[in-house]
Amino acid sequence: RYKWDEVADIEVTAVELDADLSRLYQERFPQDRVIVTDAHQYLLDHYSEFDFIWSSPPCPTHSKARFARRETTSPEYPDMKLYQEILFLRHWFKGKYVVENVKPYYTPLIPPKIRGRHHYWTNFPIPNDLENPELSFMEGKDEVNRYCAYHEIDLSTYKGGQRKDKIARNLVDYKAGKRILESAFGIMKQSNHNQLDLF
């Protein structure tokens, strides 16, 4: 979402279950509408109200990192909400959409567009060169501060139940996000849309 205002005059609705992350988001983007609820259910109930939808369903049960630690973590089914949202948007949503997630430890059930360490499912073309070499040096000692500095976000006042390193690592590269929105907006502009409502 960061830097999207540079692309177009947009109205954004952000949906986040974590109340304290929602607070941080609202402080950063006071003009956005922030809803504290389950994004998966909200998508089903409100998808038709938007022109563009970006969804990033929870990734831990899909990630290669978790599977690599399978000797020390409990087994868990992959969360199929990811594929529910892809199929739902593909068949029901009339606007442009992006569903983003990490590379899984298995062959994806629905072929994605692979860009760097992320997979994207979209109904429009996205740039091929979204990998940002700056982000490859973030992990390790002091990674939270490096991610936060790159994304210009402050997690120091976060008091919720998630680990800050997990939050920082889950931030989608804002440069990639902006370029994807530019791609969608360019296509939508050609379709004579004057203003976007974004989810």
Sequence positions of predicted segments:
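SAM cofactor-binding core of SAM-dependent methyltransferases
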Residues: 1-44, 54
